[in-house]
Design a protein with these regions (language model features):
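Membrane-interface capping segments at transmembrane-helix boundaries
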Residues: 1, 175-186
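Membrane interfacial helix motifs at helix-loop boundaries and amphipathic/re-entrant anchors
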Residues: 15-39, 73-103, 139-165
Length: 186
């Protein structure tokens, strides 16, 4: 039953991110391109899967990532208005356009799913901080990529997205640390 709930949530997440991203680029596309939620999804899926087996957490995290990514790219058929071919062709084209990220999800999903299981099993503050820290570290990673590599100016066009993401991560980290301190005092 838990796996069904995770798959349903992953499906809704993928469709929602596609709709949020939209077809017009700009601010909405920048919000839709935030990566941290895509890593948080399998981590939460691994947590929901239970605490018995790391393998189960990894499997459920991988399935959640795959379902969400497929939902995202198939939803793009309608969000982006690709309706000139028969539906099976459209699905194939949509999934082919996401091959790079689907491959990444096949690795990151199981890794973060297993981390979710570890976090649940050990009530790990470190795993909770990692989850919150994703929102802080992503903008920094993009800045490093921009400065050191072939980064694009696109991510710098809407700094409010990255500042807000960092603030969300910092607030979450603060709440986790405060909660952990209170729990250790009691």
């Amino acid at each position: 039953m838990r796996v069904l709930v995770v798959c349903t949530a992953a499906l809704a997440f993928g469709v929602g991110m596609s709709v949020l991203h939209g077809s017009g680029g700009g601010f909405r596309a920048q919000i839709g391109n935030v990566s941290a939620p895509w890593l948080l999804l399998p981590l939460v899926a691994g947590t929901v899967a239970g605490e018995q087996h790391f393998g189960l957490g990894a499997l459920v995290g991988g399935v959640a990532s795959l379902v969400a990514l497929i939902a995202f790219y198939v939803s793009n058929i309608y969000v982006l208005g690709f309706t000139g071919h028969p539906w099976p062709v459209e699905v194939g084209l949509a999934l082919r356009s996401g091959t790079y990220f689907i491959r990444i999800g096949l690795v990151s999903g199981p890794v973060f799913g297993a981390l979710g299981t570890v976090g649940r099993r050990r009530h790990s503050v470190a795993v909770a901080l990692l989850a919150a820290g994703l929102f802080v570290l992503e903008p920094l990673a993009w800045l490093v990529y921009f400065w050191l590599g072939p980064g694009t100016v696109g991510m710098l066009t809407y700094p409010a997205v990255w500042v807000a993401e960092s603030i969300v991560g910092l607030v979450a980290c603060s709440v986790i640390v405060l909660h952990a301190r209170r729990a250790s005092i009691v």
